[in-house]
């Protein structure tokens, strides 16, 4: 006896008996997708469940990734210095006089010590950092910082001991 069954909620074709050599087939088609009915009887299509848990939540890291690189980028681009200059200019009544006084002070620094200013340390940055420090904000001298992400001279000693 051979029978083929396909299910459809609404259409059933006639059955042919195979006992006498006739083939018995029942054809039904059933749609098995994510169509559901809500309380009002409307069909709701859901591709996936809406209450999905975060798989990576249990692998929470101790630090925010790439923060060190972002801090380095901000310092290299000079956003901190730009904000400091804007803050100093907003506090001054006469901006042109302020710029001229900063330039004159930077020229004095260069005249006093030409060897110190020329490489990575700039006299104008020294003047601006001094003015911002006078306002109460902590800035390194001439905005020069050693790279905190490069290992120091004792790096190999610490690594192997």
UniProtKB/Swiss-Prot annotation:
UniProt entry keywords in alphabetical sequence: Chloroplast, Plastid, Transcription, Transcription regulation, Transit peptide
Annotated GO CC locations: chloroplast; chloroplast nucleoid; plastid-encoded plastid RNA polymerase complex
The organelle targeting sequence, given as a residue range: 1-32
Subcellular location: Plastid, Chloroplast
Induction profile: By light. Induced by cytokinin (e.g. trans-zeatin).
GO biological process, one term: response to cytokinin
Disrupted-gene phenotype: Albino plants with defective chloroplasts containing a few appressed membranes but lacking thylakoids, even when grown under normal light conditions. Reduced plastid-encoded RNA polymerase (PEP) activity.
InterPro entries cross-referenced by the UniProt entry: PTAC7 (IPR038958)
Tissue: Mostly expressed in leaves, flowers and seedlings, and, to a lower extent, in roots and stems.
Domain of life: Eukaryota
Subunit structure comment from the entry: Component of the transcriptionally active chromosome (TAC) complexes. Interacts with FLN1, PTAC10, PTAC12/HMR/PAP5 and PTAC14. Binds to SL1/MTERF3.
Function: Essential for chloroplast development, especially for thylakoid formation. Involved in plastid gene expression, probably by maintaining plastid-encoded RNA polymerase (PEP) activity.
Name listed for the protein in its UniProt record: Protein PLASTID TRANSCRIPTIONALLY ACTIVE 7
Lineage: Eukaryota, Viridiplantae, Streptophyta, Embryophyta, Tracheophyta
